[in-house]
């Protein structure tokens, strides 16, 4: 069973999650086909602050060298631990993540991300801003 988590949560839960990440460094944030450079830059900045790897899955809706990405990530973008894959299948073949380590964030997920059982090997997977995650990834 894949973890589909609800992203509509109170700030209190988000703060608790961030505090708990101290114990689980090296988690990975996966953005599947991100569309908005500012969002990716801001997520990259957060990854630097929390010592998380950022993984981008093509297609991207912008050039990764876009000034907007760097601007949103400000001076931190050069410190992002960044990996990129041509598509979801390449990512799966290369990383070989365990099913239990994959956490899929959806607007209408059934579970609170605060209650998930994260580990150092966890992959936090987010879809593109306008469409979310493709069904083939969630199946």
Pin down the residues of each PLM region:
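Post-transcriptional modification and biogenesis factors for structured RNAs
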Residues: 1-139
């Amino acid at each position: 069973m894949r973890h589909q988590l609800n992203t509509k949560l109170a700030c209190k839960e988000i703060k608790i999650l961030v505090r708990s990440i101290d114990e689980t460094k090296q988690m990975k944030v996966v953005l599947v086909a991100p569309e908005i450079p500012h969002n990716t830059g801001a997520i990259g900045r957060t990854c630097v602050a929390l010592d998380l790897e950022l993984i981008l899955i093509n297609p991207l809706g912008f050039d990764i060298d876009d000034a907007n990405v760097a601007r949103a990530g400000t001076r931190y973008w050069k410190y992002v631990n960044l990996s990129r894959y041509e598509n979801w299948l390449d990512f799966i073949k290369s990383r070989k993540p365990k099913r239990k380590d994959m956490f899929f964030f959806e607007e209408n997920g059934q579970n609170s991300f605060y209650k998930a059982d994260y580990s150092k090997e966890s992959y936090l997977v987010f879809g593109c801003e306008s469409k979310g995650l493709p069904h083939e990834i969630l199946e």
